[in-house]
């Protein structure tokens, strides 16, 4: 069963994302975040196998040594693959890139799903979105989140989280948050 290390957000940042999840579910757009344990996040990496006790200890120390930071969302993105992913695209900031590199280093003794060189930071809003639903999916995002140069949308990170999940269909087994204290 796979695991993920993710950045979790504060309630204010998460609210419009939850509203998008709910509207997608109501309108039967895609199928992704209908597990009530799912939280808005940016995945830093995934692992097929990991020593969970060691990971928990490492994340406890990591959360003490690192601090919360803001992430500016620059655009809405879309991966036109079989699973059709629509997402919020964060502006690549030094803080975001450094935290992903630190996590990769911290867990280098486990086989990661993504290399820091190929990592594409994003906050997934939906998967399995049919081609004919893309315009409606984007319109729903625009109703909830306004992204302009004059009024950028920011996400406030609050914790690094350790998640155990199942794929296809997505199901969260557990989600542990480690609040940043640094």
Model-derived segments and their meaning:
Residues 1-71, 93-149, 167-182:
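Basic, often amphipathic N-terminal segments
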Residues 76-81, 155-170:
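Glycine-rich beta-strand-turn "strand-cap" elements at beta-sheet edges
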């Amino acid at each position: 069963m796979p695991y993920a290390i993710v950045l979790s957000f504060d309630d204010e940042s998460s609210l419009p994302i939850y509203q998008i999840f709910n509207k997608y579910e109501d309108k039967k757009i895609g199928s992704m975040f209908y597990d009530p344990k799912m939280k808005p996040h940016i995945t830093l990496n995934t692992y097929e196998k990991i020593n969970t006790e060691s990971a928990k200890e490492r994340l406890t120390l990591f959360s003490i040594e690192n601090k919360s930071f803001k992430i500016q969302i620059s655009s809405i993105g879309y991966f036109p693959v079989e699973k059709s992913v629509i997402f919020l695209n964060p502006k690549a900031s030094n803080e975001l890139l450094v935290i992903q590199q630190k996590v990769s280093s911290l867990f280098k003794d486990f086989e990661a799903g993504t290399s820091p060189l190929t990592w594409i930071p994003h906050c997934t809003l939906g998967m399995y979105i049919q081609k004919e639903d893309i315009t409606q999916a984007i319109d729903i995002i625009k109703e909830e989140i306004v992204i302009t140069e004059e009024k950028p949308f920011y996400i406030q990170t609050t914790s690094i989280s350790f998640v155990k999940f199942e794929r296809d269909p997505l199901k969260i087994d557990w989600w542990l948050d480690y609040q940043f204290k640094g």
